């Protein structure tokens, strides 16, 4: 279904997939290894003997893109060690890049939200955030795009798990498709911009120059709801 729906665009526009939880489900919603993802997406090799192409990086212009895999809870029973292997690889990969900008894409989000009308849980940092946010600080990552929660949130810059202009910019990319959770997430103290409620689809654009990255968020009708600019001399 995905290939049919996106086939024309993928054939004409470069496509960089980010593996998520649905890549580790079969048609009966049973957890498995990401077999279809690995079959259909010829992403760059990462040099791993155990997790080849589960995560990867590539360069486009003066940007080094790092695509991480947040699905270690799903893969652990079949093939343990995905999180720890990525932590070691990320240090080496990011440190080796000489590109001006470093951008991370990862499916599961770095923050944990309280939820309306669900069992209470504490607002804070997610397991993914605990694993990677200190590394993003250490390695000078400029921008982090996340997903999974089907909502658009701009968190601004975060460092040491707190708002800090010296940290990476964190963007939860939003909604695409017909799965929406109106009124589910209770706003996090680190949210700076939230999409108009109840949410509809949205899309993002990104423009990179020698000195700036500009990210904009739009609703399907073209209304701009957010704009962020990163600068670097």
Q: Which ranges hold each PLM region?
A:
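Short acidic, glycine-rich surface-loop motifs adjacent to enzyme active sites
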Residues: 97-115
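A short, hydrophobic/aromatic-rich structural module that often spans a beta strand
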Residues: 112, 116-123, 170, 220-233
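Conserved beta-strand->loop/alpha-helix structural units within folded catalytic cores of enzymes
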Residues: 20, 93-94, 105-108, 135-149
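Residue-level detector of high-confidence beta-strand sites
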Residues: 146, 154, 227-229
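Acidic carboxylate-rich catalytic motifs and surrounding loops in phosphoryl-/glycosyl-chemistry enzymes
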Residues: 70, 150, 218
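A short C-terminal boundary segment appended to hydrolase-like catalytic domains
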Residues: 190-233
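Extended active-site neighborhood of metal-dependent phosphoesterases/phosphodiesterases
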Residues: 1-98, 118-132, 143, 154-198, ...
């Amino acid at each position: 279904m995905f290939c049919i729906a996106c086939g024309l665009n993928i054939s004409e526009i470069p496509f960089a997939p980010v593996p998520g939880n649905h890549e580790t489900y079969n048609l009966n919603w049973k957890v498995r290894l990401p077999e279809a993802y690995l079959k259909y997406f010829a992403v760059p090799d990462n040099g791993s003997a155990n997790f080849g192409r589960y995560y990867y990086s590539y360069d486009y212009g003066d940007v080094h893109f790092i695509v991480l895999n947040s699905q270690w809870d799903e893969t652990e029973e079949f093939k343990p060690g995905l999180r720890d292997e990525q932590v070691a690889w990320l240090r080496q990969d990011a440190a080796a890049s000489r590109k001006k900008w470093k951008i991370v894409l990862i499916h599961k989000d770095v923050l944990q939200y309280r939820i309306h009308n669900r069992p209470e849980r504490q607002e804070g940092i997610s397991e993914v955030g605990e694993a990677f946010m200190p590394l993003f600080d250490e390695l000078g990552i400029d921008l982090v795009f996340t997903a999974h929660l089907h909502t658009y949130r701009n968190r601004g810059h975060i460092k040491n798990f707190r708002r800090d202009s010296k940290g990476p910019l964190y963007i939860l990319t939003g909604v695409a498709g017909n799965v929406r959770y109106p009124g589910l997430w209770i706003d996090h103290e680190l949210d700076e911009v939230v999409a108009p409620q109840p949410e509809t689809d949205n899309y993002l654009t990104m423009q990179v120059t020698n000195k700036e990255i500009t990210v904009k968020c739009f609703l399907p009708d073209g209304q701009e709801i957010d704009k962020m600019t990163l600068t670097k001399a």
